[in-house]
Amino acid sequence: MGSTCSSPESKEQNRINSIIDKQIRKDEDNEIGNQKLLLLGTGECGKSTILKQINILHSSGYTKTDLKNVAGTVYSNIIQGMATLIKAKDQFYHEVTSPELDADAQHILALAESSKDAMPFIPLTFNSIKRLWHDPTVQKTFERRAEFQMMDTLVYFMNEIDRINDPEYIPTVDDMLRIRIPTMGVVQQVIEIKGTKFRIFDVGGQRSERRKWIHLFDNVNATIFISAINEYNQKLNEDGNANRMKESIKLFETICNSRWFVQAAMILFLNKRDLFEQKLKTTSINVLFSTYLGSNDYAECVAYIQLRFERLNKYADVKKIYTHVTCATDTNQIQLVIDSVVDMVIGRNLRGTGME
């Protein structure tokens, strides 16, 4: 009779195969009930800030070590922001500055060009930043910031510059929410909210990053599309001729009507409402929307922009857009909005499974 015994190598391979099969089945089981949520939008619309808020509200938040580790990013954001202002000033104005201010500008530009990680400010750097910030020509340039690409958060950090310059400086949670690190590729986080696990994906919003979205589109439960509504008079970083809000509206139309998202909940965050309200005091949305004949009233302008987005939905008879007007750095407001979104997504899932 032939032997039915297996070799030791065969037994070991079978054991390994069994472990792999069990892990695959476990992963598949873990997928059941999970909600897949995409954060989409153009660059610098606030996607990463929303994900940080979700982490603060529904996960482990940020430890003291986490906060210490982003101090270099705060310093870098300030240096890069000031360098952007200096370059724009030189482009817009050709006024003769004092030798001291010229030296300050050259010092900051050299730091911005350095490949080294940003370090705590030495007295020369700190004093250069403050002198430049208070220079009238720099302030005139800052007032024209819609004409060039600049981080929204520079004003916040400049208002906190003395605290940030403290030798014992540790960034606060508010600082963490405002730092700018461009999302390259895809960032995934698994967070349990109200007993349901959400796999949340934050994907790069720059044009060059959008091609990386495609593999995420299968089995999406909900998409949060974020648009910074204060950008109606600003140019795109990747294309100085393209309006940022026009780009956002165009991308939303593509996402909203994509075959990939027919079954997914479509949630729209009209973000940066605080900056939008402030900008309306000096600049009408008519600069982009020539057919808008209303006033600069905040509520009226928000309603108009909301309509411009929502009317792009070609499946309005079967698909609703859930719109929220947000300020991503306002933790209390974002908590209410995220709770509402989670309840809606869970409710849709229960109805879809016949369990509600």
Swiss-Prot record:
SMART domains: G_alpha. InterPro entries: Gprotein_alpha_su, GproteinA_insert, P-loop_NTPase. Residues 33-356 form the G-alpha domain. This is Guanine nucleotide-binding protein alpha-15 subunit. A lipid is attached at residue 2 (N-myristoyl glycine). G proteins are composed of 3 units; alpha, beta and gamma. The alpha chain contains the guanine nucleotide binding site. Transmembrane segments: none annotated. Belongs to the G-alpha family. Mg(2+) binds at residues 48, 183. It comes from the Eukaryota. It comes from Caenorhabditis briggsae. One of its GO terms (cellular component) is non-motile cilium. Residues 175-183 are annotated as: G2 motif. Keywords: GTP-binding, Lipoprotein, Magnesium, Metal-binding, Myristate, Nucleotide-binding, Palmitate, Transducer. Residues 36-49 are annotated as: G1 motif. Pfam families: G-alpha. Residues 198-207 are annotated as: G3 motif. One of its GO terms (molecular function) is G protein-coupled receptor binding. Residues 267-274 are annotated as: G4 motif. GTP binds at residues 41-48, 177-183, 202-206, 271-274, 328. A lipid is attached at residue 5 (S-palmitoyl cysteine). Residues 326-331 are annotated as: G5 motif. GO terms for biological process: adenylate cyclase-modulating G protein-coupled receptor signaling pathway. Guanine nucleotide-binding proteins (G proteins) are involved as modulators or transducers in various transmembrane signaling systems. Signal peptide: none annotated.
